[in-house]
Amino acid sequence: MLRLYSTPAGLIVERDGAFFPVPQALTLDALFSAADPAALLLAALLDARPIAGGDHKGTLLAPLQSQEVWAAGVTYYRSRTARMAESKDSGGDTFYDKVYEADRPEIFFKATPHRVAAPGGGVRIRSDSRWNVPEPELTLAINSAGKIFGY
């Protein structure tokens, strides 16, 4: 298995417990556009020498370059009730009924790259917000051909 890390110094790949620098010519944009991102990454590492690893994990960046972040799905059932209650006054509570009973998941825009927090990074919550409902997320890296190549 390959693990790809984005760091301030560049991309780093972990393979079989060893860490390798990715040539700077190979970008995250190129990986997202490649038909086979893993093969492209492996080819770029043919002449790579291992580097000291593990120390980069405190300085990870979000693993995207110019990609927008989109989401698919619905919120957890417990949150559904809260969201329906909060939107009832505006008449939007029926919106969630439609989302939960749809044949396919809802697709919605989440963020542009500069608004994505790095792993372990802080998030901003509006000062006028009375409450916040954090939920776990699973993120998939999907190339331009629709193939999942990372998570």
Segment roles from a protein language model:
Residues M1-A72:
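Generic N-terminal segment detector
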Residues L40-Y151:
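Active-site microenvironments in enzyme catalytic cores
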